[in-house]
């Protein structure tokens, strides 16, 4: 699929491998005409720039874009088609300029960045890799949480690269394995929150975790381990409401077997999980909610399911809560 400009797809598939949107594009509104201008600003080649940029982009205050490519970059023994990249597309007076700012090697630094990066309060980039983190995890879903520090403003050459720091390497056991496809979230105190699709102990149904900065490092705390009855496979990450409660979805299991919507409330005794809704594969409301959640101004939750009622053979629904 390399050198493709754009691939439109109708169905939503599990896993990042089949998401083949192979370009960065921009839609510019022409207000007077109520129209949109579609412009491709970069075509991925699968080489140093990466391949399969499925996670979307983040924009900074200056209008620069940042994103990840699942694989590509370089070929290594650990991941022969490349272990993925982080890139930026800067808006300059001469047009858009694409730059690869990190190539993953597949070892201690991680492999396969499945989510886009987010900007932290320190203006550095934070993200996760689905695999890697150590030699024992190269071809397994252990994964990492990382940050990328930009070069000094005065330095404009390739001799001043972005600096990667791995904040946490998942061990694949009770601490979780395979960070989910949703972006990381910061709280007001600067802690990071995310999910792992696997791991968490004997059940291996996934976790919600917190990373807290302390003494120059980061400490992981698993705030919930899924058991199956409350869902499994929290692929899409979590979001906060204004009260500091976390909300997310699991793609599978739950009391009805088709995934769940859940909340995690902070209390003096720790985080308390509550299942808000369990999806039924034989219900027209759909099931397997792979995507993330979104609040409107009134506090309603919105999301999607990837599949609809097995008896009807549907292709998914939108839902609100």
Predicted feature locations:
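Extracellular beta-propeller repeat domains
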Residues: 2-321
